[in-house]
Regions:
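Extended beta-sheet lipid-handling architectures
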Residues: 47-49, 63-65, 90, 190
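Flexible, surface-exposed loop/linker segments and immediately adjacent secondary-structure boundaries
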Residues: 105-144
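Gly/Pro-enriched, hydrophobic low-complexity segments
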Residues: 129-135, 140-206
Length: 206
């Protein structure tokens, strides 16, 4: 029961641009190569984020802000700063949560935790073009490239129907939209992005 609650909490954390046209096959190949090359060059990332959670049964969307810090290969600190304080740290096979001062830890060694951890890290880095895991469609808009991904994994599909990544001109992710099977969705916009700046090891410890 506790694991189900944590999974739902993580997914709640994460789940339009102008007129779009589909990229040609050649354009898609070129963009994927550019995004992969850019991703390989990123060792660390820090950013502020704004999150909007839309639930059909609520008249008003839930808006939160916070900060993230990411270091390859698998260290991630996702911190909400307003209107409440909540922090979750992924490191190897461990998830540590600080819920307004109450710290708990668990092993992330089951299949769904691993899938979610990989999903979050890949979403931030933009490295999500594994066609064994996703069906991928790419579109060009006035602001950059929009990637629409449909998960193929049946376990992940229980939690996530579609994933939309919006890339800036430098092939890094500006915005993420996660759509659940219920059509509820989460939009996350990254601002003040910094790449390859030093991050103290203490950031990934609670």
């Amino acid at each position: 029961m506790k694991n189900i609650y944590i999974i739902c909490t993580i997914l709640l954390m994460f789940s339009s641009w102008g007129q779009e046209v589909s990229l040609t096959q050649a354009q898609s190949s070129d963009f994927k190569a550019k995004a992969i090359e850019r991703n390989q060059a990123i060792k660390t990332m820090q950013a502020d984020f704004k999150q909007r959670k839309h639930l059909e049964f609520m008249s008003k969307d839930i808006e939160t802000v916070g900060k993230i810090a990411y270091a390859k290969p698998d260290q991630l600190n996702w911190q909400y700063t307003a209107p409440y304080r909540y922090q979750i740290v992924f490191q190897k096979n461990t998830i540590t949560v600080n819920d307004q001062g109450k710290v708990s830890q668990m092993k992330a060694d089951n299949k769904i935790f691993k899938k979610i951890n990989a999903l979050i890290v890949s979403t931030i880095s933009g490295n999500m073009f594994d066609e064994k895991e996703f069906s991928v469609a790419l579109y060009k808009s006035t602001k950059g490239v929009h990637a629409k991904l449909l998960p193929k994994d049946k376990t992940l599909l229980k939690y996530m129907k579609e994933i939309h990544l919006f890339f800036s001109s430098d092939a890094t992710v500006d915005q993420v939209k996660l759509i659940e099977p219920t059509e509820d969705y989460t939009e996350i916009t990254f601002v003040n992005k910094q790449f390859n700046t030093p991050i103290d090891a203490s950031v990934f410890k609670l």
